[in-house]
Amino acid sequence: MCTSIVYSSNNHHYFGRNLDLEISFGEHPVITPRNYEFQYRKLPNKKAKYAMVGMAIVEDNYPLYFDASNEEGLGIAGLNFDGPCHYFPEVSGKNNVTPFELIPYLLSQYTTVAEVKEALKSVNLVKINFSEKLQLSPLHWLMADKTGESIVVESTLSGLHVYDNPVHVLTNNPEFPGQLSNLANYSNIAPSQPKNTLVPGVDLNLYSRGLGTHFLPGGMDSASRFVKVAFVRAHSPQGNNELSSVTNYFH
């Protein structure tokens, strides 16, 4: 289970994710310095303009990032997207990037979401495994920059899609437009006590604080997590310093 959030507090922006699995892949913090030359399967080798740091495993001296941010504040997290995810054969005239190359391909060269959106117009996510042992993972990506702007990138049977992300969160399935549409089912949820519209004029006993969240999903499934984290992020207080902001983020 994966959940990723872009949290803003006092003109600072915090980016991260969790990876709740019962196994470990041996991932650990990995720094890739400026001028490191990335080798691409279908593109010329290219040196990194920007350093990056994130969680990765390293195979054959190549960092396979789960998520990372570069020195200019651009961050990307890859989350499980099993089912809708679809990668493609090589396409002539496109920049054919394998999914495991996407994070370094973008973080090594770009600094803003606007630049990434422009670069993705010419990208085809090509179905090439890293190795026989390391097969491709079905992923979609949350990307955000230091302004707090964020997008979601999904490769499905209908092509590569780039969505502006007004709620600045991402979980897993279904496809991002479906996750946004589902939020309408919970639009009456509020952090305040509800107004009695059931039987107006009757003095109902609001027996507990938090009744405005009574129908907030509590499941660990991806659709429930999306609703819950979108609500919590939207109503989280801003920290009055960096420590309190980081604490709020982890909550």
Predicted segments with their positions:
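Short acidic-glycine loop/turn motifs at beta-strand connectors
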Residues: 8-11, 70-72, 145-148, 154-159
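Structured loops at beta-to-helix junctions and adjacent beta-edge loops in soluble globular domains
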Residues: 18, 79, 144-146, 155-156, ...
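A short, surface-exposed interaction/processing loop segment used at functional sites
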Residues: 24-42, 160-189
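C-terminus-biased signal that marks the final domain/tail of proteins
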Residues: 1-14, 136-137, 146, 170-251
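Short amphipathic beta-strand/extended segments with alternating polar/hydrophobic composition
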Residues: 16-18, 151-157, 163-166, 171
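Aromatic- and glycine-enriched pocket-lining scaffold segments that form the walls
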Residues: 113, 117-153
